[in-house]
A protein has these predicted regions:
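Non-catalytic, topology-defining segments of multipass membrane proteins
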Residues: 1-63, 98-211, 278-288, 292
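Membrane-embedded alpha-helical segments that form the functional core of polytopic membrane enzymes
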Residues: 50-73, 91, 95-105, 218, ...
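Transmembrane alpha-helical segments that form the membrane-embedded catalytic/substrate-channel core
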Residues: 64-74, 103, 107, 152-155, ...
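Histidine-centered catalytic micro-motifs
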Residues: 70-79, 107-119, 228-235, 259-275
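Aspartate-rich (DDxxD/NDxxD/DxxxD) Mg2+/diphosphate-binding motifs
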Residues: 73-91, 119-129
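Post-HEXXH active-site segment of zinc metalloproteases
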Residues: 85-97, 281-284
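Short, surface-exposed loop/helix-turn segments at secondary-structure junctions
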Residues: 240-247
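Hydrophobic alpha-helical segments, chiefly the membrane-spanning helices
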Residues: 296-299
Length: 299
């Protein structure tokens, strides 16, 4: 699924350099997954070992924020640039979609639209969560653990439930082709089915742990992921076919950059969505446009 950006502004890159930038790597993909899931399991284990103490609260908060950064895994595997292997891209795409409460069919199509109409109001870019005018209560609730419960009717979980019971939502109607909608509903039912199994397990074992590990992290550990996401397009121009005005590149420390899988180079990503994230810093170097530094939206 290639995104047609012919009508968008694109900075020039030498063809040979661009070819090298687009090279995928199974090694880079597995390295990232090993460190990510290794860190997740480590803090999950520490939370379990200290269960019942205040240390458990701290470790679960860290676990939840790492877990919620599965958004970056979903994104990179969705672009099929995390691995050279199609199988491993699809395998981790399904896992990270569940972790992120993203129904995989809906989000593949809405992300395709996001790249074709970035920050547009018409046709609506459904991936822009914070729009103007901003609902301040909703905005600040995104940063507070369990604040999202106040707006559960707007949550991705509620959207998945609607799809699972056969309701055609606005995003389904505008983004997903008719022939793909049954796939969306079926995968939504799988997600809801897993949620039910986890909830029933918590009830049977009389323990919050299954839910704290698999369902609730996006409610109590979403702070970092929301902060990362806000750097992309919030407060910038809408309805303009130039990513330099609608998208933002920022600079992060190495830990945050890893968790975000280098999507802080977001202008570069939108201009060249086929470049794997591990090469995005190089794409910044290779872009050869004299006026670029003056024109581009950096922070």
């Amino acid at each position: 699924m290639d995104v047609d950006l012919n009508k968008w502004h694109r900075c020039k890159i030498d063809k040979e350099d661009f070819k090298k930038l687009c090279e995928k790597s199974d090694r880079e993909g597995f390295k990232h997954m090993f460190i990510f899931f290794g860190s997740l399991f480590l803090f999950g284990y520490l939370a379990w070992m200290t269960w019942g103490s205040w240390w458990s609260f701290i470790f679960f908060l860290i676990y939840g924020n790492i877990y919620s950064c599965s958004d970056a895994l979903w994104h990179e595997t969705g672009h099929k640039t995390a691995f050279r292997s199609k199988f491993w891209n699809q395998f981790f795409y399904q896992i990270s979609s569940f972790m992120n409460n993203f129904e995989p069919v809906r989000w593949r199509w809405s992300h395709y639209k996001h790249h074709g109409h970035t920050a547009y109001a018409e046709p609506l870019d459904f991936e822009i969560v914070i729009r103007k005018p901003t609902d301040l209560i909703f905005f600040f609730s995104l940063f507070v653990p369990f604040g999202g419960v106040l707006f559960f009717h707007k949550s991705l979980q509620m959207e998945t439930i609607k799809h699972a019971i056969g309701i055609t939502t606005e995003v389904m109607e505008h983004c997903i082709p008719e022939k793909e909608r049954s796939k969306c509903r079926n995968s939504a039912r799988i997600h809801v089915g897993i949620w039910i199994i986890v909830i029933v397990s918590s009830i049977l074992y009389q323990s919050w742990l299954p839910m704290l590990y698999l369902i609730l992290p996006k409610f109590y550990g979403n702070t970092l992921q929301v902060l990362f996401g806000l750097t992309q397009h919030a407060g910038l121009y809408e309805d303009i076919k130039d990513h330099r005005y609608s998208t933002r590149t920022v600079y992060l420390n190495p830990v945050f950059s890893f968790l975000y899988w280098q999507m802080e180079y977001h202008i570069e990503h939108h201009m060249y969505p086929n470049v794997p994230s591990h090469n995005l810093p190089l794409s910044l170097i290779h872009i050869s446009e004299p006026t670029r530094q003056a024109e581009i939206s950096y922070a």
